[in-house]
């Protein structure tokens, strides 16, 4: 299990086989979260979703956008839909900014307006509002990871997982006709780049590596790898 987790880029510096055998809950949960997070965020990039070019801000370059980690791209996507809905609020985190359910209500009504209305905004009881929101998420096949209580508590991990699942299921971004090409590799070169990316992440370098060539440009990640 440890070697398999390491092979997909999880940091395993603080957990060993004995910890799993002994049932050390906090270490096991930490490893499970890394595995889930990687699976959810793996395809949130320009290569898999070239329509993400719509999220570029004024003056931002293609190279700048490539440097964004997937969680920041998700926040950008969330805010894109809030803006499109002419909503007055924006999100900068997966905790307090989503805990009252207002922004989720707008996001869902924007990505699937035929099945998700804004009725939860009329509910003043926040726990009941959270349940209404998740009922609408269920209607579009996205009631996963989050509970009313964890939404209200502003659990950042579960909220991130929920938003990632929404994006992976309903990105709701119009395709672009003239998106700049993302650098392609032959199959062998792409496999090698992926192997190096996973290996670096298994060393627990900070920040994590998502775009190998962009993230290595300043040399910081390489210096960290030498010290491991």
Predicted segments — roles?
Residues 1-228:
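Alpha-helical coiled-coil scaffolding segments
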């Amino acid at each position: 299990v440890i070697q398999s987790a390491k092979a997909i880029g999880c940091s395993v510096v603080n957990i060993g086989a004995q910890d799993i055998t002994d049932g050390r809950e906090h270490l096991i949960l930490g490893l499970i979260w890394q595995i889930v997070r990687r699976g959810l965020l793996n395809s949130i990039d320009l290569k898999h979703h070239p329509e993400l070019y719509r999220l570029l801000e004024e003056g931002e370059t293609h190279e700048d956008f490539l440097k964004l980690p997937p969680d920041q791209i998700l926040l950008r996507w969330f805010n894109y839909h809030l803006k499109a809905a002419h909503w007055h609020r924006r999100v900068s985190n997966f905790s307090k900014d989503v805990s009252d359910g207002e922004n989720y209500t707008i996001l869902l009504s924007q990505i699937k307006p035929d099945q998700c209305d804004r009725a939860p905004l009329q509910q003043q009881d926040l726990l009941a509002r959270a349940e209404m929101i998740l009922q609408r998420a269920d209607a579009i096949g996205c009631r996963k990871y989050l509970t009313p209580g964890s939404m209200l508590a502003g659990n950042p991990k579960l909220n991130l997982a929920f938003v990632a699942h929404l994006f992976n299921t309903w990105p709701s971004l119009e395709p672009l006709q003239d998106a700049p090409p993302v650098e392609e590799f032959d199959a062998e070169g792409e496999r090698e780049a992926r192997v190096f990316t996973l290996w670096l992440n298994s060393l627990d370098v900070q920040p994590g590596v998502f775009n190998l060539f962009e993230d290595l440009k300043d040399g910081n990640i390489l210096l960290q790898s030498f010290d491991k």
